[in-house]
Amino acid sequence: MRPKRLGRCCAGSRLGPGDPAALTCAPSPSASPAPEPSAQPQARGTGQRVGSRATSGSQFLSEARTGARPASEAGAKAGARRPSAFSAIQGDVRSMPDNSDAPWTRFVFQGPFGSRATGRGTGKAAGIWKTPAAYVGRRPGVSGPERAAFIRELEEALCPNLPPPVKKITQEDVKVMLYLLEELLPPVWESVTYGMVLQRERDLNTAARIGQSLVKQNSVLMEENSKLEALLGSAKEEILYLRHQVNLRDELLQLYSDSDEEDEDEEEEEEEKEAEEEQEEEEAEEDLQCAHPCDAPKLISQEALLHQHHCPQLEALQEKLRLLEEENHQLREEASQLDTLEDEEQMLILECVEQFSEASQQMAELSEVLVLRLENYERQQQEVARLQAQVLKLQQRCRMYGAETEKLQKQLASEKEIQMQLQEESVWVGSQLQDLREKYMDCGGMLIEMQEEVKTLRQQPPVSTGSATHYPYSVPLETLPGFQETLAEELRTSLRRMISDPVYFMERNYEMPRGDTSSLRYDFRYSEDREQVRGFEAEEGLMLAADIMRGEDFTPAEEFVPQEELGAAKKVPAEEGVMEEAELVSEETEGWEEVELELDEATRMNVVTSALEASGLGPSHLDMNYVLQQLANWQDAHYRRQLRWKMLQKGECPHGALPAASRTSCRSSCR
């Protein structure tokens, strides 16, 4: 090692000419069992420094195994111990003696850059590596793996209280999100109307785009995070290696400084001894010259002889001295080279520290950016949750609207069917109405013809035959004995059914089956055409009834009743005839009062049709012969009823005044 070589050189320079130990090397000060008193305090100081360095190295290793929080605490402790270490270094530098190596040691401990390089050789390197930002300045342009390697440790040291990382979005979450978005589009397009579907589709597209952008950003952040973690691991490994190298170099510098101090002390002691020996020799020579002034040439000659006698040993010593001087010169050159190398190493260390400081600043900036991105990520997570809730609400609304639209479509279809039925019915009713109008006009013409024919028949003399055929369309009443009964019964039943059941009226008048008219009682209110048809039919019925019920337009029935029947009726016993006639009159009056009441109710309900339509099987089954026969029978019955009523009032109706056919018809009509 370098201290041993320096010790050997100094020992060779202190040997005397006749010393037998000249060929041996002087022992090093650290190997001596009893050091000098002046060197003991310094040895204690160096031992303390070495112990502090060892403890700091062990502390660094233990902190490297633990987390970032103990490292930060150790950094704070190191920062707290910094002033005392610096003052101790300055005291050591001031207490050193003024020799040739003192400026070099001062350069080693203090350096050419002021207080930034302090702490070398005193165990402060670990503190510098723990907290580099407190010891260095700034240097721009640093990049590469060194910049990214120190990020994670600085993040742990600068931000120990960061919140735990948010749960990462995995590929399964992305698939679920895309599946939900794919499920939303078809029901929305099928269920909602066109405008709402477009609006919701735009909303869903925006939500899908937002989700995809969030997924992309999350994947990019995950990749960056993995890269930063890899760089941080490499940076930690490099930091551990550099710390180990720095500790080794710190120990070497400490040993070198201690050996230099010991060599300087030994050289000073040897110089003092040589000066004392030279003074003693000079004093001895002076004493000899003073005591024997005449013997001086002899002594000189003796000394010359002695020098001549010891010449080979002297030459060997001189050669050895020359070799030692050359070796010392080489060692000096090596020392200067080592100094330059140490200066370069010091500059490199300072550059590394500056790079680490810049990396720490960049890490702080990156940590701020990371915090902002985490906040943005949390906001995006909240936005995604809110959008998911909105999507669920929209799904529920879409389902509700779909059910409502289905109901409305069903109602619309039913309404369309009803509307089509009503349109068909209105068309059919219009055609029926037109037919009825034509038939009514025909019946009116025929009625006028019949009235004219009846007038002509009235003007003709009565015929003695018993037939009632005064016109070509009439039928004798004797040939139809039960016609009046059936006619009255049919009139009553038809009127009652028309009043009670309008469906029966429609079946009888418009030839509709029972299944087709089941829904008519509910559809009357929706058709204005039907109301108009009803009103028109009621007016026609009233007009027909008025035309039929006019007494002056009808032909009296006396002309059609033969005299033989009137004469035969007088043969009935008087008492029985009177009782029967009274009963018949009372029953018939009651029956016609009921019929008139029913007719009044029917007119109020706008359901009564013409008497011609009600008397038969409907307008489709009417025949002209049948209608004329009904009119004749109606006139005959009415005239007979009037005649009988007049005869009862006058008391002129004897026993058997009415024929048997008329009595049976009256009874059946009353029943």
Curated annotation (Swiss-Prot):
Transmembrane segments: none annotated. Residues 1-83, 258-289 are annotated as: Disordered. Pfam families: HAP1_N. The keyword Cytoplasm applies. Residues 212-427 form a coiled coil. One of its GO terms (molecular function) is brain-derived neurotrophic factor binding. Residues 258-288 have a biased composition (Acidic residues). One of its GO terms (biological process) is exocytosis. Residues 106-461 form the HAP1 N-terminal domain. The keyword Transport applies. Keywords: Autophagy, Cell projection, Cilium biogenesis/degradation, Coiled coil, Cytoplasm, Cytoplasmic vesicle, Cytoskeleton, Endoplasmic reticulum, Endosome, Exocytosis, Lysosome, Mitochondrion, Nucleus, Protein transport, Synapse, Transport. It is found in: Cytoplasm; Cell projection, Axon; Presynapse; Cytoplasm, Cytoskeleton. Predominantly expressed in brain. Selectively expressed in neurons. Residues 20-29 have a biased composition (Low complexity). GO terms for cellular component: actin cytoskeleton; autophagosome; axon cytoplasm; centriole; centrosome; cytoplasmic vesicle; cytoskeleton; cytosol. Self-associates. Interacts with HTT/huntingtin; enhanced by an expanded polyglutamine repeat within HTT. Interacts with DCTN1; decreased in presence of HTT with expanded polyglutamine repeat. Interacts with KLC2. Interacts with ITPR1 and APP. Interacts with AR; decreased by an expanded polyglutamine repeat within AR. Interacts with YWHAZ. Interacts with BDNF and SORT1; probably forming a complex involved in proBDNF trafficking, degradation and processing. Interacts with TBP, AHI1, HGS and KALRN. Originally identified as neuronal protein that specifically associates with HTT/huntingtin and the binding is enhanced by an expanded polyglutamine repeat within HTT possibly affecting HAP1 interaction properties. Both HTT and HAP1 are involved in intracellular trafficking and HAP1 is proposed to link HTT to motor proteins and/or transport cargos. Seems to play a role in vesicular transport within neurons and axons such as from early endosomes to late endocytic compartments and to promote neurite outgrowth. Was not found in huntingtin-containing aggregates in huntigton disease (HD) tissue. This is Huntingtin-associated protein 1. It comes from Homo sapiens.
